[in-house]
Design a protein with these regions (language model features):
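Transmembrane beta-strands of outer-membrane beta-barrel pores
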Residues: 62-66, 108-112, 130, 144-150, ...
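Residues that define the transmembrane beta-barrel architecture of outer-membrane proteins
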Residues: 52-54, 85-92, 117-124, 136, ...
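Residues on the lipid-exposed face of transmembrane beta-strands in outer-membrane beta-barrel proteins
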Residues: 47, 60, 92-98, 124-128, ...
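Transmembrane beta-barrel domains of Gram-negative outer membranes and organellar outer membranes
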Residues: 17-133, 147
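Flexible, solvent-exposed coil segments and beta strand-coil junctions
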Residues: 99-106, 158-165, 214-217, 239-243
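Repeated loop/turn-to-beta-strand initiation elements of outer-membrane beta-barrel proteins
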Residues: 100-106, 133-140, 190-193, 241-248
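Extracellular/periplasm-exposed beta-strand and loop segments of Gram-negative cell-envelope proteins
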Residues: 69-75, 79-85, 112-117, 146-178, ...
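Sec-dependent N-terminal signal peptides
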Residues: 3-13
Length: 256
């Protein structure tokens, strides 16, 4: 489950360090890759609504995604998995709406580097509020959204593929997601609840860069690709306070 708070500054800290992964089965790789992909998939924590011919919003987003498989795999590798039971994320958001009740959303995390980890994320969404276009009593919209995230971390690998010697490696997750949805919202005074449902797909390339070694138990290659798909659903609420909009959202995609 992915939980998000718009303008929630306490949710902004990102990964302090990279996880340790080893001996991943195909199922392990698919599940942990999907957790990472869902965590960095698109959201602006905004109702699928429009207001007037033109408009733009700027803000911050932050939140966490439950990641039981990541925690399990880190512990299987002999490390403390408690720091990875939830994956954090944060970023900048821009949202604009245009004539004909069209709207676009953009979020991004500038490339962030620590001593052993690097992270970047870009997402984009486009939607049409046909409920407002046809003057219906509530906003009903369709939309499509994509994301492209990169997470890489340094790891000392020691397993059969390295001859049981320590090898310095960099593990890279390059994830892309696509979501198609239909949503509805209705404003009551300053409160706007909303819902979205649709379909979600992720594709992830996982690569180990080092002089030797891999982290897969089903392959001797240093690079593997996996994908996942499933349903998508979001429940959220916006609170409009003069020039500030606050939001809270919970979503689920492909069983994460």
């Amino acid at each position: 489950m992915k939980h998000l708070l718009w303008l929630a500054f306490f949710a902004l800290p990102a990964f302090a360090q990279g996880p340790a992964l080893d001996d991943l089965s195909k199922d392990d790789l698919e599940k942990v890759s999907n957790e990472i992909a869902v965590n960095f998939s698109h959201t602006a924590v905004a109702a699928p609504s429009t207001d007037g011919l033109w408009g733009i919003e700027l803000g911050l987003i932050g939140g966490v995604t439950g990641s039981p498989k990541m925690k399990e795999l880190v512990e299987d590798a002999g490390e403390d998995g408690s720091d990875f039971k939830r994956l954090p994320h944060a970023g900048l958001m821009a949202r604009a709406h245009f004539p004909l009740e069209l709207f676009a959303e953009l979020t991004f995390i500038p490339t962030v580097e620590s001593s052993d980890l690097e992270l970047s994320n870009r997402t984009f969404a486009l939607g049409w509020n046909f409920g407002s276009f046809f003057s219906w009593p509530l906003d009903v919209a369709i939309g499509a959204q994509t994301s492209n995230s990169k997470l890489e971390f340094d790891q000392v690998l020691n397993n059969a593929s390295t001859g049981n010697t320590n090898v310095d490696t960099t593990v890279k997750f390059d994830s892309k997601t696509t979501t198609l949805w239909v949503g509805a919202s209705k404003t009551f005074a300053i409160v706007t609840p909303y819902v979205k449902v649709g379909v979600f797909k992720s594709e992830t390339d996982v690569e180990v860069n080092g002089s030797s070694g891999d982290i897969f138990d089903f392959s001797s290659e240093q690079k593997e690709s996996v994908s996942s798909s499933g349903g998508f659903g979001t429940l959220g609420v916006n609170v409009n306070l003069l020039i500030v909009r606050l939001g809270l959202e919970a979503s689920r995609a492909a069983e994460v």
